[in-house]
Regions:
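Short loop/turn segments that connect beta-strands within beta-propeller blades
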Residues: 12-16, 58-62, 152-156
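Predominantly soluble domains enriched in secretory-pathway, periplasmic, or organellar proteins
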Residues: 19, 59-60, 74, 86, ...
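Surface-exposed loop/turn positions within WD40 beta-propeller blades
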Residues: 5, 49-51, 61, 145
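Hydrophobic beta-strand positions in blades of beta-propellers and related beta-sheet-rich domains
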Residues: 7-10, 54-56, 67, 146-150
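Conserved beta-propeller blade repeats
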Residues: 25-45, 51-54, 71-92, 118-127, ...
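A structural motif specific to WD40 beta-propellers
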Residues: 19-21, 65, 158
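Predominantly five- to eight-bladed beta-propeller fold
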Residues: 1-7, 94-149, 184-188
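Blade-loop segments of beta-propeller domains
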Residues: 1-37, 71
Length: 188
């Protein structure tokens, strides 16, 4: 579950007043805050009606700038990692090959509903957030799959690693290596 913030301000240790940030989106839903390695900038996401965007906040000028369209995949943890040089980000983006999700309320069942002899549904154990049928598996795959894209501070981007179900992306302390963890079938 994600906590969203509708505004941020900055205040230096020696400053008495917090400064307003220029360039924040209207009706902001901000999350996934991430400091640059030199701590002069901060990357964060803004969730809008049709997706998630990445913004960069320059702390010296107190100005935020959007650097991606609403194609960020923030479904599996923090979608933003800074490269060691602080000049670019590694961002989990929706792949171009992403398919439409199956509407499970309208989908035709793939098998029978198990019921007791009196016609009521059989009592089964209930667990939260489990994949219960092939439609759930398909939807999970679509929601969890990201392409890793290198996004520069000016908003230009290049594909860094092809689409997979990345559960974690982390840089080594010296910034020379990146470890990615992926999820593979079968899921349980």
């Amino acid at each position: 579950r994600t906590t969203f913030y509708n505004n941020i301000k900055i205040k230096g240790i020696e400053e008495t007043e917090a400064r307003e940030i220029n360039g924040l989106p209207e009706e902001a839903q901000l999350s996934n805050f991430n400091w640059s390695p030199d701590e002069s900038k901060m990357a964060f996401t803004n969730t809008i009606e049709n997706g998630v965007q990445v913004y960069i906040l320059d702390l010296e000028t107190a100005t935020a700038k959007r650097v991606t369209e609403a194609f960020v995949n923030a479904n599996m943890g923090n979608p933003i990692s800074w490269f060691k040089d602080g000049k670019s980000l590694l961002v989990n983006m929706l792949p171009a090959t992403r398919k439409e999700l199956i509407n499970t309320a309208e989908a035709v069942p793939t098998g029978p509903t198990i019921s007791t002899s009196d016609g009521s549904k059989a009592q089964n154990r209930t667990y939260q957030d489990l994949l219960q049928n092939p439609n759930d598996v398909f939807n999970f795959e679509q929601l969890a799959t990201s392409a890793l894209v290198k996004v520069n501070l000016d908003g230009t981007s290049t594909l860094w690693k092809d689409a997979a179900m990345y559960s974690d992306v982390s840089f080594s302390p010296d910034g020379k290596y990146i470890m990615t963890s992926t999820i593979h079938k079968p899921f349980s």
